[in-house]
Amino acid sequence: MGLRPLMVGALGVVYGDIGTSPLYTMKTALEWAGGADAETALGMLSLIVWTLLITTSIKYVAVVMRADNDGEGGILALMSLLGIKHGERLGVIAMGLIGAALLYGDGAITPAISVLSALEGLKSPLPQISPYIVTLSAIILVGLFALQAQGTDRIGKLFGPVMIAWFIVIGILGLFGILRHPSVLAALDPRHGLSYLFSHGMTGFLVLGAVFLCATGAEALYADMGHFGARPIRFAWYGLVLPCLILNYAGQTAVVVDAALGQEPNPFFALCPAALQLPLVALATVATIIASQAIISGAFSMTRQAIQLGLCPRLNIAQTSATGYGQIYIGFVNWTLMALTLGLTLGFRSSDNLAAAFGIAVSLTMLLTSILMFLTMREIWKWNLAASLLTAGLFVVVDMSFVSANLMKVLEGGWFPLVVAAVIFFLMMTWHQGRDLLVKKLERDTLPLATFIAQVGAKTRVPGTAVYMTSRLDVVPVPLLHNLKHNKVLHDRIVLLRVVTASTPRVAPDLRIDVEHVGSNFHTMTVRYGFMEQPDVPEALDQCRQRGLIFNMMETSFFVGRVKIVAERRSRFAAFQAHLFEIMHRNAMAATEFFRIPPNRVIELGGQVEI
């Protein structure tokens, strides 16, 4: 696909969040600053512009997007790039999990604050509708989440053109605002922002939390890199998004300096002539829906990564498009996000109230990304210590400023994403640690495969092929031992199959399968998938034809273990965690269904394991 279509696609998916931030950023910053006077407005504009330049243009577009994992981005991809397979990288795993958990909290807030802020633009032209804005927002959000299962293949093609129209409109509105008061462009000088910060004490510090709202969508540039590539995202940012954002924020500042707010408290809508107010609200509502859609799709994509990396229980993943692999639907994630988003909408009831909750999650994720980037600079890019400390250190200082300012608003709403993130992090760590402990327990009394094959001798064989799913190919799978113990027979051909998730998003077809004959008609097979791919075992077996191994599915039986978890009295796990892991394990999607194995060819052999 050419550069232009990819740029249009990126504008419809990547830039929805950061592109709709002008709806509430300047308004919130002025309110937190305690006034809408000219000096304050110029200070806010300077801080907003330089936040966009430092955090988005320099940190993400110029530096972080270079840290791709085989083309894929996002904090989990970065975590995988740094090698989570090594036991000593527990700190890297923890940072990746915390960052991902925080983004789920942010994912619940973004749709609520975006849709509310757009519909609040109706208050001036249609004041009689004000009491119904929360209800209308809830209806729109319910409709958005309800449609997820149908996919966005068709309507998604309109997202890019709509967002192009959005950026052009807000850029033109901003330009007309600047023409009324061109002197606001002096605020592009960073000294205006620094002067405000250092001359207003605690207020200057706290207002950074509101200023940060302009950059909350910056993480999406990195997270969605795998869908469009770094080059189209960079071109779209510098060619359209950044200029239009700066124009609009400058135009809003001009309205404030010109004392032209009137009855409209939001400088964004004050930019617009009264006759065009309703069309602007309609366009803003559509843009916020697109931004919300991007957040929801991102949550689905991140969940699939977590499942493939073994950080989350298997969940049912539905493909909603025959052509777009990234278009998936995960019901559990969708309905959980909807419940959280509706709770926020009905509980906080306005974008002003939600602003205090917004920002803390993303700022913490950005801080963790900066720390992981330091490791990337040292270990992957082989930068010297001085260059790594200077670059990552600058990012950490900026991120810490925003995190500290946002933490001051924890009691006013910032607690919500932190609580959501803490719960999700605890669940993911419980699953990760529980799986490791379970695997060790299962492998404790295993028999070496070579020894078993040497002892097989003249065991009774029955026609057909038996495929045993296993995590190790050097030992005998427990289901095979159970089958031999109870049925006293072996199949003519036995395949030990291990499915491995690579630390890359995708695996090349010629590297997907390894097959080895180990004697007595035993074969070991490794099938590799990237953490962005959906495993399909029957398809992998069909690809073995070119390696001389032919499978007839009607003559092939798949043996899998079904384990019942029981908590030990003196477990390494806390009793509560052990019971929680048991519940998660019991309710996880069956391995056979996840790997797309025909259910009529599956034989489950159970056992009990204490952890």
UniProtKB/Swiss-Prot annotation:
Its main location: membrane. The chain crosses the membrane at residues 6-26, 44-64, 90-110, 129-149, 158-178, 193-213, 237-257, 280-300, 328-348, 354-374, 385-405, 410-430. It is found in: Cell inner membrane. InterPro entries: K+_transporter, K_trans_C, K_trans_N, Kup. Coiled coil: none annotated. One of its GO terms (cellular component) is plasma membrane. It is a multi-pass membrane protein. It catalyses: K(+)(in) + H(+)(in) = K(+)(out) + H(+)(out). GO terms for molecular function: potassium ion transmembrane transporter activity; symporter activity. Keywords: Cell inner membrane, Cell membrane, Ion transport, Membrane, Potassium, Potassium transport, Symport, Transmembrane, Transmembrane helix, Transport. It comes from the Bacteria. Transport of potassium into the cell. Likely operates as a K(+):H(+) symporter. Belongs to the HAK/KUP transporter (TC 2.A.72) family. This is Probable potassium transport system protein Kup 1. The lineage of its organism: Bacteria, Pseudomonadati, Pseudomonadota, Alphaproteobacteria, Hyphomicrobiales. The gene is kup1.
